[in-house]
A protein has these predicted regions:
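Conserved short alpha-helix immediately C-terminal to the canonical SAM/SAH-binding motif I
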Residues: 29-30, 63, 88-91
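NAD(P)+-binding Rossmann beta1-loop-alpha1 motif at the extreme N-terminus of oxidoreductases
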Residues: 1-46, 50, 54
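Short, well-ordered alpha-helix to beta-strand connector turns
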Residues: 40, 52, 78, 130-131
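Rossmann-like NAD(P)-binding element
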Residues: 46-82, 86
Length: 243
């Protein structure tokens, strides 16, 4: 995927390393832009996929799981696959057995960076500078794999790696990311939002920066993390009631 996350990965890799980048996106216009600006060297195809040494899957959780299942037979046993999805329990539980079956290395990941806009046109080569890269290794993860990924992500400008279980990731992300988007989106639904001109400043801008959501993507993320997110919503409602 070459949206905000995948596109920024591609641009960062091309600008900060000597690696060859192959990319794929369902949007033909995105593919054209990616090639024209040099974010990718060539399209990722079934012909060159077996040669890929590191595969970054930057699409929605359900689509990521399906893509790996469909393409697993083509992935080299010496390759490393990292998903970049915003939830980890469902993704890791689905992809890890496939990776084990076909013999390639897999680890769940989540770059802690983003913008209020999505898509390739919003992607930048410096999106990950100073950010944290979350990885979810398990007891079978080879330490040499972690060292390889650490060097790779530091080259892209990440400040460091954060290690977590899928469960811990989803529990904390429900608070630090998902809840924040819900609060921002709910906040701007007040009728007064239409009458704010001349009455708003920095605090309003801060509260509303991430109010516009990609409905399909965020619905999937919210539903995959329903238990932890519901708990955080209940906690917030309780504190609002206190006020």
């Amino acid at each position: 995927g070459l949206g905000l996350i995948g596109g920024s990965m591609a641009k960062s890799i091309k600008n900060r390393t000597a690696h060859t980048v192959w990319g794929a996106d369902l949007n033909s216009e995105t593919m054209t832009m990616a090639r024209m600006c040099g974010a990718i060297d060539a399209p990722l195809t079934e012909e060159n996929l077996p040669q890929a040494e590191l595969i970054l899957v930057a699409i929605r959780p359900g689509a990521a799981i399906e893509w790996v299942r469909q393409h697993a037979p083509l992935i080299s046993k010496s390759a490393i696959l990292v998903d970049l999805c915003g939830v980890k329990r469902t993704v890791v539980a689905s992809i890890a057995p496939v990776a084990e079956q076909y013999g390639f290395a897999y680890i769940g990941g989540h770059p802690m960076a983003g913008r209020e806009r999505g898509g390739f046109t919003a992607s930048t080569e410096d999106l990950y500078v100073g950010a944290s890269m979350i990885l979810t290794p398990d007891k079978r993860t080879d330490m040499r794999l972690l060292e390889t990924l650490k060097a790779f992500f530091l080259d892209l400008g990440f400040a460091g790696l954060t290690f977590s279980t899928p469960e811990e990731h989803d529990r904390i992300i429900a608070f630090t990311s998902q809840l924040a988007h819900i609060v921002s989106s709910a906040y701007v639904k007040s009728p007064e939002a239409q009458r704010r001109r001349g009455f708003s400043a920095g605090s309003f801008q801060d509260m509303t920066r991430v109010a516009r959501l990609d409905e399909d993507m965020w619905t999937e993320l919210f539903l995959d993390d329903e238990d932890f997110l519901t708990k955080e919503l209940d906690e917030l409602i309780g504190h609002l009631t206190d006020y």
